[in-house]
Amino acid sequence: MAVQQNKKSRSARDMRRSHDALEASTLSVEKTTGEIHLRHHVSPEGVYRGRKVIDKGADE
């Protein structure tokens, strides 16, 4: 197992961890149905940018 040669300061440790924070997912509201979905993804009803792109009945 690796052993550090010198102790890392709190500042160095925290600066390394500064990029570890999680960001909330960006959500969009579908303009025709009003549903919320991830950006650049099809809504649960199969609508993307106002157009029906997936026939929901065919999947089931």
Curated annotation (Swiss-Prot):
According to the UniProt record, where is the region Disordered? Answer: 1-28
Task: List GO terms (cellular component aspect).
Answer: large ribosomal subunit
Record-level Gene Ontology MF annotations: structural constituent of ribosome
A single GO BP annotation from the record? translation
Q: Which InterPro entries match?
A: Ribosomal_bL32, Ribosomal_bL32_bact, Ribosomal_zn-bd
Which regions are flagged for Basic and acidic residues bias? Answer: 11-22
Q: Which key words are in the record?
A: Ribonucleoprotein, Ribosomal protein
Is the Ribonucleoprotein keyword given for this protein?
yes
Recorded family membership: Belongs to the bacterial ribosomal protein bL32 family.
The family database entries (PANTHER family) matched by this protein are listed as:
50S RIBOSOMAL PROTEIN L32, LARGE RIBOSOMAL SUBUNIT PROTEIN BL32
Provide the protein name.
Large ribosomal subunit protein bL32
